[in-house]
From Swiss-Prot:
GO terms for cellular component: cytoplasm; excinuclease repair complex. NCBIfam families: PRK05298.1, uvrb. The gene is uvrB. A motif (Beta-hairpin) lies at residues 91-114. HAMAP family: UvrB. Its main location: cytoplasm. The lineage of its organism: Bacteria, Bacillati, Cyanobacteriota, Cyanophyceae, Synechococcales. Residues 25-176 form the Helicase ATP-binding domain. Forms a heterotetramer with UvrA during the search for lesions. Interacts with UvrC in an incision complex. Gene3D superfamilies: P-loop containing nucleotide triphosphate hydrolases (3.40.50.300), UVR domain (4.10.860.10). This is UvrABC system protein B. CDD domains: DEXHc_UvrB, SF2_C_UvrB. The UvrABC repair system catalyzes the recognition and processing of DNA lesions. A damage recognition complex composed of 2 UvrA and 2 UvrB subunits scans DNA for abnormalities. Upon binding of the UvrA(2)B(2) complex to a putative damaged site, the DNA wraps around one UvrB monomer. DNA wrap is dependent on ATP binding by UvrB and probably causes local melting of the DNA helix, facilitating insertion of UvrB beta-hairpin between the DNA strands. Then UvrB probes one DNA strand for the presence of a lesion. Disulfide bonds: none annotated. It comes from Synechococcus sp. (strain CC9311).
Length: 679
């Protein structure tokens, strides 16, 4: 019997039953690669859910960005309310990797800001994979990075069972070894406290406390309790408390790792000295020797991940263990928006290695640091035994490896046709667009506008705002959770128009959007290629009055093919509707917000509103950069710090580490002044 319980107020319709049947048959028959070629709004996620439910396997649903992953997680949680649907993305709010710039002899240390709530969700995912089979993990591409050793993580879990004798001192020691800290004053995630015969633990994977009640040496009761009120939420017979970090190194393995690091250091120093690189040799010896001392004394050092190969006991060049290795052997991979996601897999490894090579060549790291890396594309696919690619525009590679195992899904259960596509001249495009926006807004419909450049998007947003249009600009500096909030606000009618560059194409489920406007549609390139145009047009495919405006002076080959494919689908859909007497109806899908609700960040993000006066604030920040810190007004400091952090993150993304480091130092100075003023 399948382990999943699919809950939905409707049954498969249109060509969904055929697609589901073909994909399930392929999975059960051992097909390695299959493709679901589904037009936007045809219910691809519902088809995916049915395939997962009918095959009964643990599943990894891979998305190409955090926003899409959150949306998929929300939808799958609605389909599987009684099963484990987990969310696994990068837990960094900000991450600047360690780097060295030889031209200016500048070393930049790693700096990062970890989102504790997302870290909790990551631990929840791995815990579910150990304890049950009805697990769906929705992940971003960050799942291909190293994640400890699953066998050691499982082995290190501290068990508690009602009725069994407990060595309390031994359990406390095990918790400390698993990187939990004792705090008898304040309980919380990653901490524990002891009061008499009661042990309370804040597991890494939950925001509830685990209370273990003892009678002498015997476990009398185990309960989940509310950390704030102390209310008993659930009684348990047994529980395993997994480590607070995924990276767990037993003492004997740590000793072996130290020996291996010393051996590699000796060999590398001989090489550098032989090459006459005396400065590099001295630098490496000093850094590595200090790290070794820290590892021996406390089992940890800054940059410990650079010794991951030795700590895991892996061979040189071998693949790291990642989230995939926490799955059982018969797991199923579903790659959403595969034409984008598969390309990301190719790029991650190369970018990581280029940066590390500079650090190794200049004596900042041992060569083994290069093995602290994401999976190579071929390593990833060797671990994925069965895959279903999902896309409205699958790439050539996916279609090739699927070898005819393609299920096409064109008919929408709602009967809604693909959008009408109209080409209009670029002359006066902004004023023409303004009129269209006002018309749609009067009907309480939403509009998406995509431009070619960030500057154009900013200018258009300003212009629309000046003309009393409720508009927001979705840009790359916005944190993942806030991005979800902005999209939710569009759906809820907080504003009518969302402007962006390359953030509005794949997978965003926005039934309220009736108009998509593509400015400069005839400018050939990645953003105006056939696949990109089809995806962007598809953002209006869930609305009965869906329409796409392409502003262009000439008809490019990409435009012609995109329009031709859209018309082909419209004809198929129209014929099906006539044959079955179907009248197109609105999707009526509620604006789910479960991820934000779970993290309890929704209202906080709305209150922060960092983009409301983005242009004005950025101007103040630039001006302040040229002024002496001592001359700044105190009430301007928080605003300035926020903007400098945005600039710092943008610089890090562009690999301009010198500028990012300068901004980081500036931020520290401003914060010191702010703290000093409050004393």
């Amino acid at each position: 019997m399948p382990a999943y319980e699919l809950s939905a107020p409707y049954t498969p319709k249109g060509d969904q039953p055929t697609a589901i049947s073909k994909l399930v048959e392929g999975v059960n028959g051992g097909e390695r690669y299959q493709t679901l070629l589904g037009a936007t709004g045809t219910g691809k996620t519902f088809t995916m859910a049915n395939v997962i439910a009918q095959t009964g396997r643990p599943a990894l649903v891979l998305a190409h960005n955090k926003t899409l992953a959150a949306q998929l997680c929300n939808e799958l949680r609605e389909f599987f309310p009684h099963n484990a649907v987990e969310y696994f993305i990068s837990y960094y709010d900000y991450y600047q990797p360690e780097a060295y710039v030889p031209v200016s002899d500048t070393y930049i240390a790693k700096t990062a800001s970890i989102n504790e709530e997302i870290d909790m969700l990551r631990h929840s995912a791995t815990r579910s994979l150990f304890e049950r089979r009805d697990v769906i993990v929705v992940a971003s591409i960050s799942c291909i990075y190293g994640l400890g050793i699953p066998s050691e993580y499982l082995k290190a879990a501290v068990p508690f069972k009602v009725g069994e004798t407990l060595n309390l001192r031994g359990s406390l020691r095990d918790l400390v070894n698993n990187q939990y800290s004792r705090n008898d004053t304040e309980a919380g995630r990653g901490r524990f406290r002891v009061k008499g015969d009661v042990l309370e633990i804040g597991p890494a994977y939950d925001d509830r406390l685990v209370r273990v009640e003892l009678f002498g040496d015997e476990v009398e009761a185990i309960r989940y309790v509310d950390p704030t009120t102390g209310e008993i939420l659930q009684s348990l017979d047994a529980i395993s408390i997994y480590p607070a970090k995924h990276f767990v190194t037993p003492k004997e393995r740590l000793n072996d790792a130290v020996k291996a690091i010393r051996s590699e250091l000796k060999e590398r120093l001989e090489f550098l000295n032989g090459e006459g690189k005396l400065l590099e040799a001295q630098r490496l010896e000093q850094r590595a020797t200090y790290d070794l001392e820290m590892l021996q004394q406390i089992g940890y050092c800054n940059g410990v991940e650079n010794y991951a190969r030795h700590l895991a006991g892996r061979e040189p060049g071998s693949a790291p263990e990642c989230l995939i290795d926490y799955f059982p052997d018969d797991w199923l991979l579903i790659v959403d928006e595969s034409h984008v996601t598969c390309s990301q897999l190719l790029a991650m490894y190369n970018g990581d290695q280029a940066r590390k090579k500079v650090l190794i060549d200049h004596g900042f790291r041992l060569p083994s640091a290069a093995d602290n890396r994401p999976l190579k594309s071929e390593e990833f696919w060797s671990k994925a035994k069965q895959t279903v690619f999902v896309s409205a525009t699958p790439g050539n590679w996916e279609m090739e490896v699927s070898e005819g195992q393609v299920a096409e899904q064109v008919i929408r259960p709602t009967g809604v046709l693909d959008p009408l596509v109209e080409v209009r001249p670029t002359t006066g495009q902004v004023d023409d667009l303004l009129g269209e926006i006002r018309d749609r807004a009067s009907k309480k419909q939403r509009v998406l506008v995509t431009t070619l450049t960030k500057r154009m998007a900013e200018d258009l947003t300003d212009y629309l705002a000046e003309n009393k249009v409720r508009v927001r600009y979705l840009h790359s500096e916005i944190h993942s959770i806030e991005r979800i909030e902005i999209i939710q606000d569009l759906r809820l009618g907080e504003y009518d128009v969302l402007v962006g560059v390359n953030l509005l194409r794949e997978g965003l489920d926005l039934p309220e959007v009736s108009l998509v406007a593509i400015l400069d549609a005839d400018k050939e390139g990645f953003l105006r290629a056939q696949r990109s145009l089809i995806q962007t047009i598809g953002r209006a495919a869930r609305h009965v009055e869906g329409k796409a405006l392409l502003y262009a002076e000439t008809m490019t080959d990409s435009m012609a093919k995109a329009i031709e494919e859209t018309e082909r689908r419209r004809k198929i859909q129209h014929t099906y509707n006539e044959k079955h007497g179907i009248t197109p109806t609105a999707a009526g899908k509620k604006a789910s917000n479960s991820i934000l609700s779970f993290l309890e960040l929704s209202r906080k993000l709305k209150a922060d509103g960092p983009d409301a006066d983005l242009v004005k604030v950025a101007g103040k920040a630039v001006q302040a950069l040229e002024e002496d810190v001592d001359g700044l007004a105190l009430d301007a400091l928080p605003e300035l710090i926020d903007q400098l952090e945005l600039k710092m993150k943008e610089s890090a993304k562009k690999l301009d580490f010198e500028e990012a480091a300068n901004l980081r130092d500036r931020i520290k100075k401003l914060r010191q002044k702010l703290v000093g003023s409050s004393r």
